[in-house]
A protein has these predicted regions:
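N-terminal auxiliary "cap/dimerization" subdomain that precedes the catalytic jelly-roll/cupin core
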Residues: 1-65
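Active-site environment of non-heme Fe oxygenases that use a 2-His-1-carboxylate facial triad
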Residues: 1-25, 33, 73-228, 233, ...
Length: 296
């Protein structure tokens, strides 16, 4: 959380070698022009196991621009099971031990560092969103058309500096030949349940259910479990991700613990104009996304 950011991590472990910059450029290209995923252990980059948090922070700063992930302006978020129930209005999915649904986050790239894996479970599952889109286009072109239209998203309870009750944006979109997928069903469902937000019709609900069912197809999924020191980077416009439920150790020092950073990328793609309200900018390479801090 903020304690990591306040410790001056960006100053204490400089990354200066040409090999590190080669790694940075390779990661950027893989994320935007490749499969949209990059996974590596800190030790294979730095050769040592110490200062992994600092290496992670420095690497992220070279790859892109870290964004605020809360109204407190946290740029490094500590991901642990907070013991909150699923119906708690302040709960954020990553801070539970329950299975998550496939989704994307409000940034170009999401980055994780695993400090401690769970005792069991917590498997990461990733699908290529363009592959999912192609399946839907082939099997249910009628639903594909619906998913390319705007859906209401309820403003998250943790997004306190946002005065808007909801925004509307498509799940599948294309701008200037660049595909993009953005999806977080929990906020769509919350909008549907809110009398002050637009209701979903039956066709929209069917389209969302079919999208979820396609993501469940094992042949489309890449599955693995992050181990201590593993970093994972995902392009949120070209992948959807989730993790399975997990059981923690009793020892608090051994409980599952990840760090998360949201990145705006200098080589990002242009996105549909409808994302401007939620992301702040839609042009290629623009700094966009994140959550506006309450105090600037």
């Amino acid at each position: 959380m903020n304690d990591y950011y306040s410790q001056g991590l960006k100053k204490r472990t400089p990354i200066n070698s040409s090999s590190h910059y080669d790694i940075v450029n390779n990661i950027k290209n893989l994320l935007e022009k490749g499969e949209g995923t990059y996974r590596e252990n800190c030790k294979s980059i730095d050769g040592v196991e110490e200062n992994q948090e600092e290496l992670f922070w420095n690497l992220c700063n070279l790859i892109g621009t870290p964004l605020s992930q809360s109204t407190q302006g946290e740029k490094i978020l500590s991901i642990k099971n907070a013991g909150l129930s699923a119906d708690d209005p302040k709960v954020r999915g990553p801070n539970t031990n329950q299975k998550l649904s496939f989704h994307s986050d409000r940034c170009d790239v999401i980055a994780f560092l695993c400090l401690q894996p769970a005792r069991s479970g917590g498997e990461n599952q990733i699908v290529q969103s363009e592959e999912v889109e192609q399946v839907i286009r082939k099997e249910r072109i009628d639903l594909h058309s619906i998913l390319s239209q705007k859906f209401p998203y309820k403003t998250h309870t943790i997004d306190g500096a946002n005065p808007l009750p909801y925004c509307e944006q498509p799940i599948f979109s294309n701008r200037d030949g660049f595909f993009a997928c953005s999806y977080l069903r929990v906020l769509i469902d919350r909008a549907d349940q809110d009398p002050h937000c637009p209701d979903l019709n039956d066709s929209q609900k069917e389209a969302l259910d079919f999208l979820d069912s396609v993501c469940e197809r094992k042949e489309l999924q890449s599955c693995f479990t992050l181990q201590k020191g593993d970093m994972l980077f995902l392009n949120n416009w070209t992948t959807l991700h989730r993790r399975t439920a997990f059981d923690d150790h009793e020892d608090s020092e051994k409980k599952r613990h990840l760090l998360r950073i949201w990145l705006s990328m200098p080589n990002s793609r242009p996105i549909d104009e409808s994302f401007r309200r939620n992301f702040g900018a839609v042009e290629a390479g623009a700094i966009r996304g994140g959550i506006t801090p309450s105090i600037q």
